[in-house]
A protein has these predicted regions:
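Catalytic cores of Mg2+-dependent Asp-rich isoprenoid enzymes
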Residues: 1, 5-81, 92-224
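Active-site flanking residues adjacent to catalytic metal/cofactor-binding acidic residues
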Residues: 89
């Protein structure tokens, strides 16, 4: 577990090294490339997926040796999905602190600079790139759904604890597709009532054969 703690801490340290000077100077600093964005998502969340998978295999379940690597890979992508949602949902708040997790290299492809994301009128220019990252997040969420399918049916609590963040994540992506994320006044998030509804639905789904796969398929982002 110390290894994974170190990875998470290393992500936070890199965060401070990258963005500390920008925050102090009142400027906005962006991650340089998509590879650095992916590395950040791995360090702060993908590594948690590895730790969670390791603990599950040691204490709650078993898989054939040839399936374990696949399980870990999907666990990493599960964590990355949740971190990507945080990044894509919290753009205005991060910008206020001088942090832009949207890679500068990608922004340049659309003739944008990090500062341009401070103006919500630039949403139309930003939308194509933003949709690319929502698509990537959906791919990670699909891996998370496949991860859940690998969990034993008898492990109700384990499945439920994985299903709820995926259901909320799927719904969040759907909301982010249509809202203006650059408008700091338009806070985009899943409501408490929706979360309570998902909690009830997933409990029913766990009791019905095939219910888990159905609810996760029905709930995924289909807005494109």
């Amino acid at each position: 577990s110390d290894v994974y703690k170190r990875q998470i801490v290393s992500g936070q340290v890199l965060d401070l090294e990258r963005f500390g000077p920008a925050n102090e100077g009142g400027e906005i600093s962006a991650l340089p490339t998509g590879a650095e964005m992916d590395d950040y998502a791995y360090r702060v969340a993908g590594s948690v997926g590895v730790f969670w998978s390791k603990m599950s295999l040691e204490h709650l379940m078993s898989l054939p040796p040839d399936k374990e690597e696949e399980f870990f890979v999907k666990g990493i992508r599960f964590g990355k999905a949740l971190q990507m949602i945080n990044i894509l949902r919290d753009i205005p708040e991060d910008l206020r602190f001088g942090r832009c997790y949207i890679p500068e290299k990608d922004l340049k492809r659309f003739n944008l600079k990090p500062d341009d994301l401070m103006d919500d009128k630039n949403i139309d220019a930003f939308r194509p790139l933003y949709d690319e990252y929502l698509d990537l997040t959906n791919e990670h969420l699909e891996a998370a759904v496949e991860y859940i399918a690998m969990l034993p049916d008898k492990q109700f609590r384990l499945k439920a604890s994985c299903m709820l963040p995926v259901l909320i994540g799927q719904r969040t992506v759907t909301l982010l597709r249509t809202g203006n994320i650059l408008n700091s006044e338009e806070r985009i998030k899943v409501t408490r009532d929706e979360i309570k509804s998902y909690a009830r639905k997933l409990l029913r789904a766990l009791l019905i054969p095939g219910g888990v796969a159905r609810i996760l398929k029905k709930n995924k982002d289909n807005t494109k």
